[in-house]
Amino acid sequence: MTANTAYTASSHEATTNSFSRRALIGGTAALGAVGLLSACGNGSASSEKTKAAGAGAKIEDLYNINAQDVNSLKKGGTLRLPAGSIGPNFNFYTQSGNTSDNVNVMSTISQAGMWNLDFDGTYKLNTNFGVSFEHSKKDDKIQVAVKLNPKAVFNDGTPITYKALQSTWNIFKSLDNGYNIVTSGIYEFVESVEKGDDDYSAIVTFSKPYYPLQSLFSEILHPALEDVELFNNGFVDAPHPEYWAGPFTLADKGWDSTAKTFSVVPNDKWWDTKPLLDKIVFTQMESSAARAAFKNDEIDAIGASTSSTYAEVKNIAGTELRKGTRLYAGGLDINPRRVKDAALRKAIFVGTNREALAKIQFQGLPYEETIPGSMIHMPFSPYYQDSYPTPNNSVSEAQKILEAAGYTKNGDYYEKDGVKAGCAVVVFGDDPTTKGKAQTFTQQMKDVGIEIRIDQHADSEFATILGNWDYDISFSGYSVSTPDATAGTKQFYYSENNEGIGSKEIDALIDAMTLIEDDKERNLACNEIEKKHMAEFAFLGTITNGPDFVMVKKNLANYGPRLYKSMDWTAVGWMNS
């Protein structure tokens, strides 16, 4: 078998992400989830406005982690970080666990996968787990030869062999196997995963092509997770460190479900570069509590992407602002499982004044952006196109949609078959910015003739409510975890991922898109799918990308906005001066 393309180990990369799915993020920036940060500037906070990166932006201008040689940093110390919601389901491969906070917290202890991303989103072998990745064609089918690092083991001592690759495939290959997965991604196109020359090699044969191939085994799961009950429910309030592998592991009694703290320490079973830090402690906090904690020197970093947080923390001595654009898209998430009438969803899309909501979001921040129009591409991507339906921001056009669908006005609101046109917007946390958006949105919809109720919840309930689809409308969105939109397009717009909501026509377009080998052609096809889906089904809409402003202790190194680059927790540490 002659390989057409080979990726071979040449240098050690410390961490990996899962690139086959995109994680839920709240409507405001995560409190300390640097896994989702991008573009950055230096120095303390200033009033100079930052403009969102657009077409032609230079990648080197879009990140700053205060990069320092690890040999120049202190050995030891503790890093204290806030999180809006930790758990309750620590299996972040499930729908109920797939939140940015969970992904960020668990990334310290769970890094098994073949790939890392560089700043610009290019793939690099994660040599802690993968030695080589070669693909070729045999009998007109794509085959991938994988070689694993024989040093790699899960924390319970289970070696990471071809059996782990088989288990990963078995779990993700179908949405119909009982696993509560987010998306099947590349795995449903795999025909077989077989043992290669030894236990640390495997031959993967595809039933039909899928691109990019580098999304294969971006995650490697412990064979024990093939137990459906364990996969779906076994990680609720139980991180199970024995099933993961990474440079850190859960400390003794490291998950305190009462205090809502998640503490990790260096993993003595880790075979590669040892971490600098002695401990990382994540604490679940509401926004107001996090602001107070940062001012009182109880945490070392805080997201400052809302005006209230930014105003409170921007001038604290010994800190600096690292700022940029989030790898995030969204802000108008209408749950089609609850808001079932497509006409009502379309009217909400068309009647929403996105500019007014974005103005509230960014008021008081030194940041400005053009309203984005894509869930799958960032505006600085060469593939970016505005997919949001037109016309929009129009009360009259929204009313026409309702009336064409059989709604009639009765007082302030439309109704149909005796049922008022309305639903609830769920709001998390106590940040005034989010509450202001909800109140403005409610008035916008009243102008259209749709009644919106505000459903208030704590930040800590975010994962449970959204993971269980227990909401009508949310200001949340998703991470834009890679520059390639293939997996995101399938996750968002394939009907099987949305309980059948969609169309056979769009599903066929997605199936055809995954067969396109040329990256540009495939990603442009993703745009056409997104435009069609938004226009017809209207349940994932864009209001902002937004900044990722993070206030940090000045002497914190190798931590901050890093664009697409995989997080290297081993290199995070404290400078000597």
Q: Residue locations for each model-derived region?
A:
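Detector for C-terminal structural segments
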Residues: T2, T8-N17, A30-L31, L37, ...
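N-terminal export leaders
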Residues: S20-I25
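Surface-exposed binding/hinge segments that line
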Residues: K74, I181-L230
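N-terminal lobe/hinge region of extracytoplasmic solute-binding protein
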Residues: L79-K137, N170, Y243
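Gly/Pro-rich hinge or "lid" segments in bacterial periplasmic/extracellular proteins
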Residues: S100, T108, F119-D120, S218-P275, ...
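Aromatic- and charge-enriched surface segment that lines or borders ligand/interaction sites
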Residues: S132-G178, I203, K340
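Append "and occasionally in soluble cytosolic enzymes with long acidic Gly/Pro-rich linkers
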Residues: S263-V265, K340-Q443, E528, N576
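Ligand-site clamp/hinge motif
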Residues: P266-E312, E451, A458-D459
